[in-house]
């Protein structure tokens, strides 16, 4: 399996697992996984209602696997940093890009410091 396909599989597996586990503060709010293997986008959303009056909808985790073999973390709103979990799955730090940081800050992260 080539690196891009492997990274897509890892991203999908981690986010599917997250969509099925964990506890929500409000039972009426659910997690939804959205995966696009063709374009390499993997997202987790919160969807539902808080106290029947406040709509909850938003992406809290977005990974993008690019054709150059990098995993871009576009957003990580989790308590368990996805970058650490990717490293534990065998993804080298130089293949993980913090897309949510400005390009000039990325070189200080210890991870890849590329521009999109």
Identify the residue ranges that each predicted region occupies.
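Terminal domain-initiation and capping elements
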Residues: 1-116
């Amino acid at each position: 399996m080539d690196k891009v396909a492997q990274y897509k599989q890892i991203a999908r597996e981690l986010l599917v697992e997250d969509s099925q586990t964990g506890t929500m503060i409000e039972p009426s709010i659910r997690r939804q996984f959205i995966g696009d293997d063709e374009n390499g986008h993997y997202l987790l959303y919160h969807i539902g209602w808080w106290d029947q009056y406040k709509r909850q909808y938003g992406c809290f985790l977005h990974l993008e696997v690019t054709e150059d073999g990098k995993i871009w973390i576009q957003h990580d709103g989790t308590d368990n940093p996805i970058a650490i979990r990717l490293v534990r799955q065998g993804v080298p730090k130089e293949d993980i890009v913090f897309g949510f940081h400005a390009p000039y800050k990325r070189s200080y992260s210890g991870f890849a410091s590329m521009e999109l």
